[in-house]
Swiss-Prot record:
PROSITE patterns tied to this protein: EF_HAND_2
An MF annotation (GO) of this entry: calcium ion binding
Listed name of the protein: Uncharacterized calcium-binding protein R08D7.5
CDD domains named among the record's database cross-references: EFh
Highest rank taxon of the organism: Eukaryota
GO terms under cellular component: centriole; centrosome; nucleus
Record's signal peptide: none
SMART domains: EFh
Residue ranges annotated for the EF-hand domain, each copy included: 77-112, 113-148
Keyword Repeat: yes
């Protein structure tokens, strides 16, 4: 992340990787927003390092503080979006997504997949072919794949 030439600076282009290393799971839109805030905040900082493609620890810290301050409303919005997506896969509101649900959505989208592919999707999300996956498992796999 840091280089020998700039040991006290981190590349802005690596902000998402830095956030993941710190235990965050940011969406691309949030990373872009944080990058913009870092760049915009520089005009107010005395002693700015002068490297436009880099950030220092203070800039990262300030960005993390603003992320944490806004976390609840952003998290609520993401949860609402994921819940809406879950309902698209669970039209009967059973609380689970089954292989049959995945097949139905694939058919609606014009996708042709083998049965083994649907089974693998359910297993990858932590479910089994008989019971499918619940909402929490759906949320977790969506976050892992960076779709939310």
């Amino acid at each position: 992340m840091c280089t020998e030439q700039k040991p006290n600076l981190l590349k802005l282009s690596q902000l998402k990787m830095v956030l993941r290393a710190l235990g965050y799971d940011p969406r691309n839109s949030k990373v872009q927003e944080m990058t913009r805030k870092i760049k915009d905040g520089r005009s107010m900082v005395m002693g700015w390092h002068g490297e436009k493609d880099y950030m220092d620890v203070d800039e990262l810290w300030n960005a993390l503080q603003s992320k944490d301050d806004e976390g609840d409303s952003t998290e609520d919005k993401v949860t609402t979006e994921m819940r809406s997506a879950f309902k698209l896969f669970d039209p009967e509101s059973k609380g689970t997504i089954t292989v049959a649900n995945l097949k139905m959505v694939a058919k609606e989208l014009g996708e042709t997949l083998a049965d083994a592919d649907f089974d693998e999707m359910i297993r990858e999300a932590g479910g089994d072919n008989n019971t499918g996956i619940n909402e929490q498992q759906f949320f977790e796999i969506m976050k892992k794949t960076c779709l939310y």
